[in-house]
Amino acid sequence: MEMERVHEFPHTHMDRRPRKRARLGWDVLPQATKAQVGMFCGQEIGNISSFASSGAPSDNSSSLCVKGVARNGSPPWREDDKDGHYIFELGDDLTPRYKIYSKMGEGTFGQVLECWDRERKEMVAVKIVRGVKKYREAAMIEIEMLQQLGKHDKGGNRCVQIRNWFDYRNHICIVFEKLGSSLYDFLRKNNYRSFPIDLVREIGWQLLECVAFMHDLRMIHTDLKPENILLVSSDYVKIPEYKGSRLQRDVCYKRVPKSSAIKVIDFGSTTYERQDQTYIVSTRHYRAPEVILGLGWSYPCDVWSVGCIIVELCTGEALFQTHENLEHLAMMERVLGPFPQQMLKKVDRHSEKYVRRGRLDWPDGATSRDSLKAVLKLPRLQNLIMQHVDHSAGELINMVQGLLRFDPSERITAREALRHPFFARRR
């Protein structure tokens, strides 16, 4: 029986062509005959009996191939669910190398499982992508991007580190270092309480440093959001938070991460910079105005997302909570002021309905009274930040205004933002 190729790094080439997946030794159904000898490539061979050598792959080859016999004890073959998600049980083996311990999360792409790596003797996070063509293709793009980032991020301090990847039962599986919770999950479990300003400063600097690093490599992440920023450690401390007047204060406690170290994840939507990119990118709350208006986008769309994230860390809530384009644009004007007329004159034909007589068609274009209320309740950016920040508010407001400039050509770059006085206190 021919076994499939399992990949370890470094890679010298990636073939994106679709192919029929060879059946794995651990995919054999219970009634099958004894495991047969076959070719097995990569470091998974450490879990194959009759292994000839324990040497690691050389730098000159993408994998190491030896003959081996697959072990028994693989989980029974299960059909995927109707959406193409992999069906598993805790304690299952995911290839002979990885043992499933828990489910860490899920999304439209698939699931993330906490697994024990028998070879490295450590816990890892394994992203199991849905067995659907478009998600498999996106996973291969993510792997390529992770490889490129890994080549240049020698210290591994900016982006999540990929350990391995393989194709198992029609699911692309990407093995990552195990990190802590996402910023979103931390906020949610903390009842959406804001972060202290010094922590916002540290996280903001790291995030901008990662974005600047990617932009230097001509990469655009396109999906920056709190869900895609992980704390390296989930450890936290509780600090008192005082509410009410000085005479009668109620004390409650909120969680604060012990460490400010973060890493960016999810590079499935990452693309290289090129002309005329007009398709929709980014998750709604963090989507830049040029994307909504069909004006084309580039590096500045990431910078806009960072600005929204920094405000959210200061307040505990997403800045623009909407799911409709015109309402979203109206919220932007409410918080940041009117759009430049030259931007509104250039909108594409799909976005013309949002503009009337050179201005945003609001409030006339509002679809409901609730929509009007949602926009009117938003304060100006300065007032919003000052409600939550005691010191450094002026510097923070100035920097965020630069990150959230409507015109992408006038928006500050990530590298410029790193030199802003707001970050002087950390240097």
Curated annotation (Swiss-Prot):
Show the InterPro entries listed in the entry: CLK_kinases (IPR051175), Kinase-like_dom_sf (IPR011009), Prot_kinase_dom (IPR000719), Ser/Thr_kinase_AS (IPR008271)
Please list the residues that bind ATP.
Answer: M104, G105, E106, G107, T108, F109, G110, Q111, V112, K127
Q: Which residues form the active site?
A: D223
User: Which UniProt keywords are given for this protein, alphabetically ordered?
Assistant: ATP-binding, Kinase, Nucleotide-binding, Serine/threonine-protein kinase, Transferase
Every copy of the Protein kinase domain together lies at 98-423
Enzyme class (EC, first level): transferase
UniProt-listed Enzyme Commission number(s): 2.7.12.1
Instruction: Reply yes or no: does the keyword Secreted apply.
Output: no
Catalyzed chemical reaction(s): L-seryl-[protein] + ATP = O-phospho-L-seryl-[protein] + ADP + H(+); L-threonyl-[protein] + ATP = O-phospho-L-threonyl-[protein] + ADP + H(+); L-tyrosyl-[protein] + ATP = O-phospho-L-tyrosyl-[protein] + ADP + H(+)
List the molecular function annotations (GO) for this entry.
Answer: ATP binding; protein kinase activity; protein serine kinase activity; protein serine/threonine kinase activity; protein serine/threonine/tyrosine kinase activity; protein tyrosine kinase activity
Q: Return one Gene Ontology term, BP aspect.
A: mRNA processing
- Could you tell me which Pfam families the record lists for this protein? Pkinase (PF00069)
Instruction: Give start-end of the signal peptide.
Output: none
The record's family statement is: Belongs to the protein kinase superfamily. CMGC Ser/Thr protein kinase family. Lammer subfamily.
Tell me the protein's name.
Serine/threonine-protein kinase AFC2
Q: Which organism is it from?
A: Arabidopsis thaliana (Mouse-ear cress)
Highest classification ranks of the organism: Eukaryota, Viridiplantae, Streptophyta, Embryophyta, Tracheophyta
